[in-house]
């Protein structure tokens, strides 16, 4: 039996780097050697809060190289560089017909695995992709695109879905609260849609990066975001506010910064039990809309990949910290408590 290294979740916040069986492709599926896997907050929440039964191998922001093919696979050959999405819908059910792909039963099944209960598998040297992932959720990486950039196709997809859920039109003013890696992606994608984008954060490093990427910035440590937004919008407020920060304070600032009839997307609120107080009477009287959105969409899959591969969304500057698999716990610790200059944390399997 061939073995590989993997960071296995066994119920503790500390992952165990172990040797486990190398996966084999099923008919129509394939095995991918992982190059880089981004550390995502949804996985860290599952680890920290014990939201998923062990054992599992997490990691779903994946770029790698096709290693082995199952019978009947024609789209790829061994050696092809690919991005693999871990969730892909059936495109035939009630929810798919409504374009609510994240509610599809097949979508909810994780389609990539390094072993155990499927959970992404990117924190391992190899993973297997199910046939529907190979058919509709694997994307070739063009020559010249770095693996640490390519692995961000999946989060860019989720952010583009959020931006489009806010129905942003050219010439509108959009506020993004928070300028971590997700906030930066939201800012850049709103710019792609033609918006003038105002952003806020507490970190001087992140605000400086946002300015270099074309955002108009506000230091949230000073307070007064709502007043600043009104000054920047001739007293009206933002057409849409995208939340890339958690907590009652940022949520209140988002609601207060939105014009009457505007849209609020609480993109960062992905944990069940994450509750905020809101004055529904005030919200209704001003006809402000809270727009819920979750996960990725096949509708923007091709465009999201093109935005990443073409460099129209600048991502190289976001990947600030890369760790070998042997230091996966150090990587997750840095994600939990980022340094002043930390943006995106990644596991680079090529480092050992």
Spans of features found by a protein language model:
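Mid-domain Rossmann-like dinucleotide-binding core that forms the NAD(H)/NADP(H) cofactor-binding site
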Residues: 143-223, 227
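C-terminal hydrophobic helical "lid"/dimerization subdomain
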Residues: 1-6, 252-256, 298-352
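Residues located in well-ordered beta-strands
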Residues: 5, 16, 21, 33, ...
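Glycine-rich beta-strand-centered segment in the early N-terminal region that forms part
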Residues: 23-37, 50-97, 142-144
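Glycine-rich phosphate-binding loop and adjacent beta-alpha segment
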Residues: 248-310, 346-352
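NAD(P)H dinucleotide-binding glycine-rich loop of Rossmann-like/cofactor-binding domains
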Residues: 92-177
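A short acidic, Gly/Pro-enriched loop at the edge of an enzyme's catalytic core
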Residues: 229-238
């Amino acid at each position: 039996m061939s073995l590989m290294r993997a960071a296995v979740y066994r119920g503790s916040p500390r992952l165990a780097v172990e040797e486990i069986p190398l996966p084999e492709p099923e008919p129509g599926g394939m095995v991918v050697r992982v190059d880089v896997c981004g550390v995502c907050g949804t996985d860290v929440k599952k680890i920290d809060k014990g939201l998923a039964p062990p054992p599992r191998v997490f990691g779903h922001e994946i770029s790698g190289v096709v290693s082995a093919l199952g019978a009947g696979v024609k789209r790829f050959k061994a050696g092809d560089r690919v991005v693999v999405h871990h969730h892909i819908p059936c495109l035939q059910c009630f929810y798919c017909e409504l374009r609510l792909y994240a509610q599809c039963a097949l979508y909810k099944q994780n389609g990539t695995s390094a072993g155990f209960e499927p959970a992404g598998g990117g924190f391992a040297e190899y993973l297997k992709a199910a046939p529907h992932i190979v058919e509709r959720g694997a994307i070739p990486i063009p020559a010249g695109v770095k693996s640490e950039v390519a692995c961000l196709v999946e989060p860019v997809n989720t952010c583009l879905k959020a931006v489009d859920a806010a129905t942003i039109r050219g010439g509108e003013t959009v506020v993004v609260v928070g300028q971590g890696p997700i906030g930066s992606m939201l800012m850049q994608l709103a710019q792609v849609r033609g918006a003038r984008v105002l952003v806020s954060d507490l970190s001087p490093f992140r605000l400086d990066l946002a300015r270099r990427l074309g955002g108009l910035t506000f230091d949230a440590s000073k307070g007064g975001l709502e007043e600043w937004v009104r000054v920047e919008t001739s007293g009206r407020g933002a057409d849409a506010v995208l939340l890339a920060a958690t907590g009652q304070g940022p949520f209140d600032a988002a609601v207060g910064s939105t014009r009457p009839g505007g849209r609020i997307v609480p993109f960062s609120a992905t944990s069940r039990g994450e509750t905020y107080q809101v004055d529904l009477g005030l919200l209704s009287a001003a006809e402000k809309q809270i727009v819920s959105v979750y996960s990725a969409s096949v509708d923007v899959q091709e465009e999201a990949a093109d935005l990443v591969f073409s460099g129209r969304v600048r991502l190289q500057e976001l990947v600030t910290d890369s760790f070998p698999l042997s230091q996966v716990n150090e990587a997750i610790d840095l994600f939990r408590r980022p340094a002043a200059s930390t943006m995106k944390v990644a596991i680079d399997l090529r480092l050992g």
